[in-house]
């Protein structure tokens, strides 16, 4: 009996010591890049339903010159207003992925990049150039943007 107890305790200990499977961070980084590309296309086409699929319910967005947006409702309201703004030529919007880092655990990542969009002004069309960072979290097996912040370069 004593041998059985020792055997089972050893099995339990060894099972607990089994390392978690190694995450392929390169593949996960590629997933994040592809999500950012899909998000760019959704912005270009003003597809609000698609845009909203990229955010987690508690997502925080730090938009230039506005109060911090928290949660899907406030983020969606902001995108609706932005897409309705006829001075913003959304079909010209672009995002360039500069750097992607995925945590070793594979559940958190960030991406930095640059964005461009043409804007109508009283003096003609100007290029808005900016930069930003999105933080992604894997929730129930899916990557969702939990924090985004961006601003413009000096124009």
Where are these regions (language model features)?
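Bacterial Sec-dependent N-terminal signal peptides
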Residues: 1-26
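Short beta-strand edge/turn micro-motifs at domain boundaries
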Residues: 21, 129-154
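Short beta-strand segments enriched in hydrophobic/aromatic residues
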Residues: 55, 115-117, 149-152
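Beta-strand elements of well-folded, non-transmembrane domains
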Residues: 117-121, 136
